[in-house]
Amino acid sequence: MVLTRSAAAAAKSTPKEDETETIKPQPEPETKPQNYRYVTEDGVKHILAYRYSGSDASLLYNNVISPLAQWLVDHVLSPRLAPNAITIGALSLVILSHVIMLCYSPNMVEEAPRWVYANAGLSLLFYQILDVADGKQARKTGNSSPLGLLFDHGCDALNVVVSACTFASTIMLGPTYWSLLIFLAPAMVFFMATWEEYYTGTLALPIINGPNEGLLIMYSIYIVTAIVGPNVWTQPNILFPQLNNNHVFVLITITSAVGQCLFSAVVAIRSMERKAKDGAAALVGITPFIALILLSALWVLWSPSDVFTDHPRLLIWTVGLVFAKMVMHMMLSHMCEEPYWLLRKTFMIQLVVSFLLVAGIVPWGHESSVVQLFFVISLSAYVHMIYFLSTELATILGIRIFKVKQG
C-alpha cells in the first residue's frame, strides 16, 4: 500500500534530489486583491517569497524514476504543456482505473478480469513518473510556483484515497473494516509528513519511502495479481493460518505506517525544541485527524445498519475528502507561515453530527442518507477550496493555472 511520507516531495516547486530550490520571489501587485477566501493579507506576502526545501534519498527515484521523467520532459512533452496539466493527467489515469475497477468489483470483493489489475498497475506507474515529470517541466519552463506545489499536493492526497479503494478491491478486502484500514494507513503517513513539514520547514525523504518504494510495492502487487489472479489474497497465510494473506498485508502496512508516523512526530518535536519552543504542543495539530480516524472507525464497527457493507467506497471517499482538505489547509498554513486552524467548518459539522449519532444522542434515521449527505458536504467543500484557492494563488502570483508563463 502507499506508505507515502509526502507527495509534496514530488511537487513542481522543487527537485526531489538533495537540494533546495529558491523560487524567484514574485513582485508584489500594485493593487492587492481583497476578499480572498483562503489567503490572508499577511499570507500574500509569504506566498510571494515562499521557498520550498526538500530532498529524496531513494535509490529507486534517483536511478530510475527521475531519469525516466527527465527523458519524458526532454523528448516527449511539449514545452507549451503546463505542469499542472501533467498533474491532472496523471491523476486522471488512476481515477479512470478506479472507475473501471468499480464497475467490475463494486463491493471490493468480486473478481475482475485480469486486465483490470494490469491496467491499475500501469496507471499507478505512469502516475508516479508523471508526478515527477510535472516538477521537471515546471523547472524547465521556469514555471515553478507555490501554486504548483499545492496543486500537486492536493492531487497526491486524492490519489491516496482513490488508490486505496482500487487496492482494496485488488486484494479482495470487501466491505469490511480491513478496507478502511488500508486507506487510513497511507492517509496517516501523508498527514503526519505534512504536519512534520509544517513544523520543520523542510521534507527529507529517506532511502526507502512511500512516493517511490511504496508505489513500487503497489503496482507490483497489481501486476502479480493480474498474472496469478486475486483469489490468492483470500487464502490462509502460511505463517499465520488464522489470517488470510490480504489481512496479513494490511497488518504489515498499518504497522509500517504507525512507525513512520512516530518518526515524523519525533522529528517535528525535536525541531520545535531546537527552536526553544514546546515540542509537545505541536501534537495539538494532529487532534482533528485523530478524531476523524476514531469516529470513522467507530462508525464502521458499530453502524446500526452496517452501512459500510452497502456503501464501502462512499464512506472512504467521504472520509478521504475531509482528510485531503485537512492536508491542503496545513500546507497552505505552512506556505503562508500562519497558525494551522484546527476547527474548520466542514470538519466540525461532520464531527459533531457523527459524535451525536455514535453516542446515541440523536437517532440514526436512514443511515445511508447520512453518509450520502456527508459525501455531498465533503465534496462541495473540497471543490470550493480547490477552485477558489487555485484562482487566488494564480492572481497573487500573476500566473495562469493551466498555461505556461512565457519569459
Segments predicted by a language model, with ranges:
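Short, flexible/disordered secondary-structure transition segments
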Residues: 103-110, 133-140, 161-165, 175, ...
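Histidine/cysteine- and/or acidic
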Residues: 121, 137-211, 219
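Alpha-helical transmembrane segments of multi-pass membrane proteins
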Residues: 90-94, 156, 349-353
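Membrane-embedded alpha-helical segments that form the functional core of polytopic membrane enzymes
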Residues: 88-149, 163-164, 178-189, 249-253
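Juxtamembrane "helix exit" motif at the C-terminal ends of alpha-helical transmembrane segments
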Residues: 93-109, 168, 223-229, 355-362
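N-terminal signal-anchor/initial transmembrane insertion module
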Residues: 44-113, 117, 128-129
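C-terminal membrane-associated helical module and adjoining short loops/tails
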Residues: 2-78, 186-407
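Structural signal for hydrophobic/aromatic residues that build the beta-strand cores
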Residues: 72, 82, 131, 135-138, ...
